[in-house]
């Protein structure tokens, strides 16, 4: 018996079509850098508006980090995204 179908089934449990499976830093439109956040309330709004993510919080470096970002929205560090131009 192959373990592949079982592993695949476990990966897909709970994931509905269109449901995000990743987290990440939203990208600034101006310079492609991570986005600064003064507080979690601002970050949550940034995540909704910039990354179409339902939630987010400020990390330890006051950078906005979003949860459940849709796969079609680029986040910082994705292949093909331009480097941060500070």
From Swiss-Prot:
Where does the record place the LCN-type CS-alpha/beta domain?
22-85
Cite the GO molecular-function annotations of the record.
sodium channel inhibitor activity; toxin activity
Compartments where located: Secreted
Which ranges of the sequence are coiled-coil?
none
* Keywords from the UniProt entry: Disulfide bond, Ion channel impairing toxin, Neurotoxin, Secreted, Signal, Toxin, Voltage-gated sodium channel impairing toxin
Q: Spell out the disulfide connections.
A: 33-84, 37-58, 43-64, 47-66
Which Gene3D superfamilies did the record assign?
Answer: Knottin, scorpion toxin-like
Report the superkingdom from the record.
Answer: Eukaryota
GO terms under cellular component: extracellular region
Tell me the function of this protein.
Answer: Beta toxins bind voltage-independently at site-4 of sodium channels (Nav) and shift the voltage of activation toward more negative potentials thereby affecting sodium channel activation and promoting spontaneous and repetitive firing.
> Which family does this protein fall into?
Belongs to the long (4 C-C) scorpion toxin superfamily. Sodium channel inhibitor family. Beta subfamily.
Q: What is this protein called?
A: Toxin Tpa5
This protein's species is Tityus pachyurus (Colombian scorpion)
């Amino acid at each position: 018996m192959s373990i592949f179908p079982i592993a695949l089934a476990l990966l897909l449990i709970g994931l509905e079509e269109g449901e995000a499976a990743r987290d990440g830093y939203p990208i600034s439109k101006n310079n492609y850098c991570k986005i600064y956040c003064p507080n979690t309330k601002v970050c949550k709004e940034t995540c909704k508006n910039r990354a179409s993510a339902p939630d987010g919080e400020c990390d330890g470096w006051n950078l906005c980090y979003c949860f459940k970002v849709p796969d079609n929205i680029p986040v910082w560090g994705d292949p093909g995204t331009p480097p941060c131009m500070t």
